[in-house]
């Protein structure tokens, strides 16, 4: 099973690159984050599941036609697909900027949610995506 994950920062502007990536590497699953649209492009040989709420978030998961997976849940920050052998979470995790009121608590809620999801699964869970881990200021796109 070959899985590719990429924060595309806008799926429409990267459509040609995504298509080349799919043709070159022939992945079974492609997980994209920060898609910024609810209308993901279609690529030959793949079906797509997409969820987006605003211009800053969104996830899309492409499954090759030879892969059988069942969509189970999504919001603008995650999309879950269940397979026979595992559960896949494509995640664009909320940013946890301590300088913005409410961001830390929102991130903690997400962290609690993902821990419960993993604990309650009977199958292995694969989490891929942009985990937005900002351990130090150097990890930030907007350092002080």
Predicted feature residues:
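Active-site-proximal beta-strand elements of phosphoester/diester hydrolases
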Residues: 1-10, 85-97, 128
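Short catalytic/ligand-binding loop motif for oxyanion handling, primarily in non-cytosolic enzymes
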Residues: 12, 38-41, 96-100, 134-143
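Short amphipathic alpha-helices and their capping/turn segments at secondary-structure boundaries
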Residues: 20-23, 77-84, 112-123
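Structured beta-strand-rich core segments of catalytic domains in phosphoester-bond hydrolases
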Residues: 35-99
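Surface-exposed cleft-lining segments at the edges of enzyme active sites
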Residues: 92-114, 141-144
């Amino acid at each position: 099973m070959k899985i590719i994950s990429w924060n595309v920062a806008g799926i429409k502007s990267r459509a040609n690159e995504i298509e080349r990536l799919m043709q070159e590497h022939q992945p079974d699953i492609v997980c994209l984050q920060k898609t910024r649209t609810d209308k993901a492009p279609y690529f030959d040989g793949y079906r797509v599941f997409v969820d987006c709420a605003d211009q800053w978030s969104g996830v899309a998961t492409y499954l090759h036609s030879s892969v059988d997976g069942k969509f189970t849940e999504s919001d603008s920050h995650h999309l879950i697909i269940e397979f026979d052998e595992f559960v896949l979470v494509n995640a664009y995790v909320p940013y946890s900027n301590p300088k913005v009121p409410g961001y830390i608590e929102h991130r903690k809620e997400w962290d609690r949610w993902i821990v419960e999801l993993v604990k309650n699964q009977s199958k292995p869970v694969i989490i891929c995506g942009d985990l937005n881990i900002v351990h130090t200021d150097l990890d930030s796109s907007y350092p002080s």
